[in-house]
Each structure stands twice: as structure tokens, then as C-alpha cells.
Amino acid sequence: MASPGEPNRTAEDESQAAARRIERLSLHLTPIPLDDSQGVEMETCAAGKAKAKIEVDMGSLSLYMRGKHREIQERVFEYFNSRPELQTPVGISMADHRELCMKQLVGLVREAGIRPFRFVNEDPAKYFAIMEAVGSVDVSLAIKMGVQFSLWGGSVINLGTKKHRDRFFDGIDNVDYPGCFAMTELHHGSNVQGLQTTATFDPITDEFIINTPNDGAIKWWIGNAAVHGKFATVFAKLVLPTHDSRKTADMGVHAFIVPIRDLKSHKTLPGIEIHDCGHKVGLNGVDNGALRFRSVRIPRDNLLNRFGEVSRDGKYKSSLPSINKRFAATLGELVGGRVGLAYSSASVLKIASTIAIRYSLLRQQFGPPKQPEVSILDYQSQQHKLMPMLASTYAFHFSTMQLVEKYAQMKKTHDEELVGDVHALSAGLKAYVTSYTAKSLSTCREACGGHGYAVVNRFGTLRNDHDIFQTFEGDNTVLLQQVAAYLLKQYQEKFQGGTLAVTWNYLRESMNTYLSQPNPVTARWESADHLRDPKFQLDAFQYRTSRLLQSVAVRLRKHTKNLGSFGAWNRCLNHLLTLAESHIESVILAQFIESVQRCPNANTQATLKLVCDLYALDRIWNDIGTYRNVDYVAPNKAKAIHKLTEYLCFQVRNIAQELVDAFDLPDHVTRAPIAMKSNAYSQYTQYIGF
């Protein structure tokens, strides 16, 4: 009964009050893990609200973020800092940029003594650490390095055998043999099995004849082809003669080493036509070209024969029984490119967020009457733009580091389950991280106003150079479909009692949770302790993925009856893409939480917990409609999530300087006047001649 003078309480009020009491009781019984009070001193501001003042242990945070290979990164930084003539100037022409990029790569290898190719298979984490460092010098250089060592070099050592490694390793390693990776054609990119270039075996001369049958089969966008390449790994359909002289046998797409220029004179070899693809939106330090082959003959030994070979008498032999299995094995060995792009994209985001946040702390505009102007990062709108992005940068750092570790383990063990896991994870992270970074680069530019528009402050160059990350090594939309297909396969395994791969284990439990109704009591819990509980956050992410998976499986089954499997997939395509993105966000959050829990320093753990909470709640709020539609979150809880997200943005703003400093990027690496650690405006004015 309500006491006299109190308004009548509704049944909903009673229900909410009961829910809060149950929540408080459960929190007493089950303490929230990862209490982030370590290193957080509470003080009371004028309004009487608690305001957290966090003292960040910079040494510990920076050390935890560094990874194992900071030493070799510093060697890269020191080399280019000592050679200012190798720094890429603003406004450089395409021709000069290409030559400079080649000089940078040769200097790195021959002068600095850093040999990335030796780590491609032996220590992939070290290789990607070098790539991150050179990418901060010039993204074109990182891509040039990737073409030379990961694509051209990687195809030789991963698709070839000992005879190929013995013949080509040293020349690739010291850049005496600059090479190309000739897969994409004018008419076919994502559909590699649709490539039209042919490699026909001639048993009389013991040679393959490489031929471009039509304009659609011209190799297109081939890095290193326009100017510097001397060899190309050409992907072509292997065609063998049969007993019937009028017929041939198509054995599927294989890889062949094709010399394209003379080693001494550098002249284009007979039968090969090379053209320059010209100016691009970005990455103009990379010489992309187009290749046409007119019945070019190469020795039989130039077939990269790890997964299939042709004998002297034209017989085909492979340990893999079908074209599809050989094709999958071939492409599977090239997954490192996607791993590298996800990792590199996160590195680009570190540079951009560092520049934007340092400038936002420096820049002052407006303020209370008769008081000093305030930093633009003190405005809630600026915090809303940049703080969730900073949290995502940290999340991507840990998730891509884990991907690199898994990839390295896969290269050592060749464990079949791990191979499948890395393929799907690299596809999803590459697609998700590069798409997010592309949008964020524009946000950073806008957040820095007019000064963000100056080329010298790098946003334009970074945005243009990074833009293609969404397309090469697999179009992002296509890659997300691969993730969705893998999820549906795991879903089928779950209901058939099979074993799920490690990354997908959560589906077993969360699918069971999804198939029951959301708990009406927990749907109303709104305390900060509950919302910042990693279990609530991860459960919410995984519930959403399971809900999307279950519903799209039902839709596909329904539409397949009338449209067939291809038509049904296309009808549900947007749903499938949302499912894939949801799964990748779950993977990213799970790894972020694990990285926080694994941190040995209590102060740093508290700092990272704050950033992780912002990442999780911002993502939940970003898709709050989904949670509301199924009553996973009640209206009062949705409002609490929004309020807490805004507060966490404010909290992260208070340590934003320390968080970007922990990326440990020296001024000569960020190279943006507005982001200098000291005297930024002075250096900016000096740059234009004052």
C-alpha cells in the first residue's frame, strides 16, 4: 500500500522495484569481476556527482601495447629518421613516388639490414610488425613490401617446392628479383575460379604456353608490373592434352612463375605486353600495371607444384582428389594477405586517431562568458566522434594481434581445425576493421576542421591510401558472406551434435539461450555495475548473433524451396551481412575482455577495462533497436546504457592523451604538424614559411 501523499504505484513500478532488488541481491551473491577501482581515485565535483580521476601508468600501458617486436620497429623508425631524403614529401609526382618507394624498400633491406622475407613463414608476427612500422612511413611502401615478400615471395615459398625456394629465395629476399602477383583479371577479381588466362602444356617441348585469350583475361591492377617487376606469379587454368587430339582437360587454376622482363636490360620479354594502370585514388607509390600474354612459353618446372604437378609425358598428379580441393588449398596458403591488411588497417587507425585526438586537445574554441576558451575535446559532440573510435582502435589492436598469433600457430602446426578458423576469422576481421577504419578516417578529418584538410596533416593521404583496403585481398562484401557461410555450417554442426571450432564454441550455449525467451527481470537491470559486467556485455553480443543466425537459417530454408539456393542466398544477403558483422563484433569484444583480464598490472587493467566498457556499450547502443525489438533490453535499461556510454566517453576523454601516447608513435612517424607533442602551431607555421 502506498502511504498517504504518495502517488499510486503501478504494477510496472512494482515490477521495476522488484527487479532492482533482485539485481542488487544477485550482485552481492556474485561479485562483478574485473573491478576497475585499481588506480581510480574518486572525487566529488561541484554538482555533487562522483567524478573518476584516473592516473594512468604510462610505462605499464605502453609496454603492454608494444607487443614482442617493438625493437625491430624502432630500427625501422630510426633508419628512416636518419635518412630524410627517403621520407615521402607532400605533392610528390606519381613517377617520383614510385622510384622513391623502390629506393625505400631497397634501403630497408640492404642498408638497414632488415630482411622481412625471412620472417614471412618463420615468424609472421615479426613480419607484420615490420609492415606496421613501414606503413607509418608510407602506406605505399607497406603495400610495395607486401607485394614483393608476402604475395610474390609468399606464392613461391608456399605454393612451390624446394626447387623453387632454392632458385628464387635469395633474389626475392634481397630485392634482386622484384616480382608480381598476377591473379586479378579485367573481368574477374573475386571469382578466382572464373579466371580465363590459360597455361597449356606442350608435351613435345616440355613447356607451358601462357596465353591471354581475350581482353577480359588481361591481368589487371598487378602491383610491381608497370615499372619494377621482373617476374610474375601468374594464376591460370592448367590445360592438358588428352588422347583425343581434338579435346583438352581443364585441371583448374594453378600458379606459374613467368619472367616478364630481362634481368639485365630490364626490357619487356617477347610475347608479353605491359601497360601502366595510371593514377589511382591513392597508393601512387605502387606501380600497378596490366599484363597480356601472347603464347609465352615457360619451362614445365615453373609450375608451382606443391598441390599438383605435371609429368614429362603430360600426366597430372595430386594428393588432393578434386579441382575444388586443390583450389581451396592454393588460396588457403595466401590467407596471410588478409591477416596483414586487418593488422595494417588497425595501425592506420592508430595514426589517424593519434593525430585527431592530439589536435582536439590542443585546439581551443569558445568557452563560458569571461573565461578562457576550452579544448574542443571538452565538447560532448567531439567526444562522441572520437572516444568510441579510440576504444575501437584498442579493440582492433588486441583482436588483430590475436589473429596474427593464430596465423603463426597455423603455419607451424597446419592443424586442420585451426586452418578453417583462421580463414574465417581473417576474412571477417579484414572486412570489418578496414570498413570501420575507412569511415573513421573521414570522421578524423572532419573533427580537425580546416587544418584536417591540409595534406601535410595526413588525413587525406591516409584516407586515399587506405580506401582500397576494402577491396583488395577480397572484397569486403564477399568476405563477410564467407563468414556468414561458415557460421551457417557451424550452426548445422551444432544441431547435428558435431564439434565446433574454438572461435565458434559460444554458439552452442548462446543458441540455447536464444531459443528460450529473454529474462524479463535481467532485461530491466540498469545499474552501472551490471552494465559494466563483461558477462552482460558478451552475452548481449552473442545473443544478437545467435538470434540473427537462427532467423536467417529459417529464412534461407523457406526461400530455397521457391528460389533455389542461389536465389535464396541473394534474397537474404543483407541479413547475412549483418549476421557476419555481429559475429565479428562478438569475437573482437571477447578478445578485448580476455586481453584486459590477462594484463598483469592492476592500474593498466583498470584503464583498459574502462576503454573496453566504452567499446562494448557503444556497440550495444549502436544496435539498440535490435535488443528492444525482442525485449532483451527494457526501455529504462536502454536509457541507462545511453547515459552510461556518454559518461564513459567523458571518462575516456580524461585519459585520451595517455591512451594515444601508449601507441608510442614518435613525432617523426606521425609527421603531422597539428599532432606534434610540443609547439604544434609553431611547427605548422614554420612549415608554410613563416
UniProtKB/Swiss-Prot annotation:
Cofactors demanded by this protein: FAD
Primary location recorded for the protein, binned into one broad class: other
Catalytic activity line of the entry: a 2,3-saturated acyl-CoA + O2 = a (2E)-enoyl-CoA + H2O2
GO molecular function, one term: acyl-CoA oxidase activity
Amino acids binding FAD: 448-453
Transit peptide: 1-45
Gene3D superfamilies in the cross-refs: Butyryl-CoA Dehydrogenase, subunit A, domain 2 (2.40.110.10), Butyryl-CoA Dehydrogenase, subunit A, domain 3 (1.20.140.10)
Protein EC: 1.3.3.6
General function of this protein: Catalyzes the desaturation of long-chain acyl-CoAs to 2-trans-enoyl-CoAs.
Family note: Belongs to the acyl-CoA oxidase family.
Protein name: Acyl-coenzyme A oxidase, peroxisomal
Species whose genome carries this gene: Cucurbita maxima
Gene (name only): Acx
